[in-house]
């Protein structure tokens, strides 16, 4: 093997080692930010394709609806407990903090936290879903103003 080929081989090995090290460091840095999404039914019975169930202590995101009558607030602190459900089951959630303005019973939420024993989630963050038909107040006012205009405004000037 001549010197030129040896140098190319060493350069290729160095590039591959550097790439592997970079990928390893990125994955190590992101491991604390990777949260898998589950529904309450998937927490209870596992993911449909793989039947993989989350482990106690695993960080995850859970999406579902807040069960009617399940919200309980501690009068002495910001601690709130509630139940989220889907068609296949329900899980209990504990959260300490200020809830979003759109949070209410019967509304969709996504909670991010850790799974504890007994299918209980200790939430670090609660996100309330809004209706897909939501319109900002400014846009709604503009739409109402346009609908009140006389019909002559909408006619084609060429006709």
From Swiss-Prot:
Chain ranges on the Periplasmic side, renumbered to this chain: 30-159
Q: Which domain of life is it from?
A: Bacteria
Q: Name one GO molecular function term.
A: heme binding
Q: What is the lineage of its organism?
A: Bacteria, Pseudomonadati, Pseudomonadota, Gammaproteobacteria, Enterobacterales
Q: Which family does it belong to?
A: Belongs to the CcmE/CycJ family.
Give UniProt keywords alphabetically. Answer: Cell inner membrane, Cell membrane, Cytochrome c-type biogenesis, Heme, Iron, Membrane, Metal-binding, Signal-anchor, Transmembrane, Transmembrane helix
List the InterPro entries hit by this protein, alphabetically: CcmE, CcmE-like_sf, NA-bd_OB-fold
What single Pfam family name could you report for this chain, choosing any that match? CcmE
Q: Where is this region: Disordered?
A: 132-159
Question: What residue spans carry the Basic and acidic residues bias annotation?
Answer: 132-147
| TM region(s), chain numbering | 9-29
Q: Which organism is it from?
A: Shigella sonnei (strain Ss046)
Q: How does it sit in the membrane?
A: Single-pass type II membrane protein
The protein's name in its UniProt record: Cytochrome c-type biogenesis protein CcmE
Which coarse location class describes where this protein primarily resides? membrane
Q: What does this chain do?
A: Heme chaperone required for the biogenesis of c-type cytochromes. Transiently binds heme delivered by CcmC and transfers the heme to apo-cytochromes in a process facilitated by CcmF and CcmH.
Report the locations given in the UniProt record: Cell inner membrane
Binding residues annotated for heme, in chain numbering: 130, 134
Q: State which ranges are Cytoplasmic (membrane side).
A: 1-8
């Amino acid at each position: 093997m001549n010197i030129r080929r040896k140098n190319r081989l060493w350069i290729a090995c160095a590039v591959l080692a550097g790439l592997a090290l970079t990928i390893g460091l990125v994955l190590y840095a992101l491991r604390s930010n990777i949260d898998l999404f589950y529904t309450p039914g998937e927490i209870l019975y596992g993911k449909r394709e793989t039947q993989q169930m989350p482990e106690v202590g695993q960080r995850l995101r859970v999406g579902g609806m807040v069960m009617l009558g399940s919200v309980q607030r501690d009068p002495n602190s910001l601690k709130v407990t509630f139940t989220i459900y889907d068609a296949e089951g329900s899980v209990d959630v504990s959260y300490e903090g200020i809830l979003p303005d759109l949070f209410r019973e019967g509304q969709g939420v996504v909670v991010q936290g850790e799974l504890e024993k007994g299918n209980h989630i200790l939430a670090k963050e609660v996100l309330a879903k809004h209706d897909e038909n939501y319109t900002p107040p400014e846009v709604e006012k503009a739409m109402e103003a346009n609908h009140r205009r006389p019909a002559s405004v909408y006619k084609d000037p060429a006709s």
